[in-house]
Amino acid sequence: MEHFRGTTILSVRRQEQVVIGGDGQVSMNNIVMKGNARKVRRLFHNQVIAGFAGGTADAFTLFERFEAKLEKHQGNLTRAAVELAKDWRSDRSLRRLEALLAVADHKASYVISGNGDVIEPEYGLIAIGSGGPYAQAAARALLENTDFSARVIVEKALSIAADICIYTNTHLTVEELSG
């Protein structure tokens, strides 16, 4: 079976702003299947932003489950993330899903992994997907050495990742929340 792979999702938190951005490329082995996929979206009445890396169908399943958890817990990001992770670990059908979610609201940011882990990032920075290490390095350098806004850092770091990672392109979707 052919596997869809590759993407880059980056989240940066700076001052009263949190931004998640992602590229638009969907690849199957060495073929670009789509260049303008939307892997970042707003959830729960525009109070939460989220991005995914991994299998597209798997990620949409997780988005739906995560949004249901947000509704159930009235937008409490931490509780929704932990409850989704519990389900992910205990539900056999979910355990087979291959995706990572990066989620954020005004207060917190998390990576929710396929192992059922909920990870709060260091430095207010999340980078997942095939181009994640490149985007993370670029974003960290920009965070430490410039006064750029979180949005500018996300855009520049994703552009750098796209120059390096063959599974990442420059068709970006960027969402932000400001406090």
From Swiss-Prot:
Regulation: Allosterically activated by HslU binding.
One BP annotation, GO: proteolysis involved in protein catabolic process
Any one GO CC term of the record: HslUV protease complex
A Pfam match: Proteasome
Keywords: Allosteric enzyme, Cytoplasm, Hydrolase, Metal-binding, Protease, Sodium, Threonine protease
UniProt GO molecular function: metal ion binding; threonine-type endopeptidase activity
Subcellular location: Cytoplasm
List of catalytic residues: 7
Gene3D superfamilies named among the record's database cross-references: Glutamine Phosphoribosylpyrophosphate, subunit 1, domain 1 (3.60.20.10)
Record bears the keyword DNA-binding: no
Its EC number(s): 3.4.25.2
Disulfide bonds: none
Ligand binding (Na(+)): 162, 165, 168
Catalytic reaction equation(s): ATP-dependent cleavage of peptide bonds with broad specificity
Domain of life where this protein originates: Bacteria
Function, in words: Protease subunit of a proteasome-like degradation complex believed to be a general protein degrading machinery.
Family per similarity comment: Belongs to the peptidase T1B family. HslV subfamily.
Subunit structure, interactors included: A double ring-shaped homohexamer of HslV is capped on each side by a ring-shaped HslU homohexamer. The assembly of the HslU/HslV complex is dependent on binding of ATP.
Name of protein: ATP-dependent protease subunit HslV
Species per Swiss-Prot/TrEMBL record: Nitrosococcus oceani (strain ATCC 19707 / BCRC 17464 / JCM 30415 / NCIMB 11848 / C-107)
Organism placement in taxonomy: Bacteria, Pseudomonadati, Pseudomonadota, Gammaproteobacteria, Chromatiales
